Amino acid sequence: MKTKAILIDPNLPRISTERVDGFEDIQRMIGCRCFTCVRFPDGKHVAYVDDEGLINGTELGVKFIDSIYPDALAGKILILADDGQGGDADCELTGSDIQAMVKGIVRFS
């Protein structure tokens, strides 16, 4: 079953709604082999990011407001909701919600 997600692509920059079905789709959408999760303070949403983004030459990233996450996250970010049992659920946030949480795009040197 496909799950609604929000994809942030700092290279375009663009925020879009996507559908994912499992970890292979997450890997494909954020363009990595190994990803990690950043839990949002609402306890309901999780951002999937490239676990090696800061060491593999990724040039651009996203800086959220400090209450979401204090450091810039490298590369594309995929946001899903948590079903409370270790699985994914439809993201309840909108593109506008996400835009309000993003401080800007950063370049890593």
Positions of the model-derived regions?
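Domain-length accessory/inserted modules outside core catalytic folds
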Residues: M1-S109
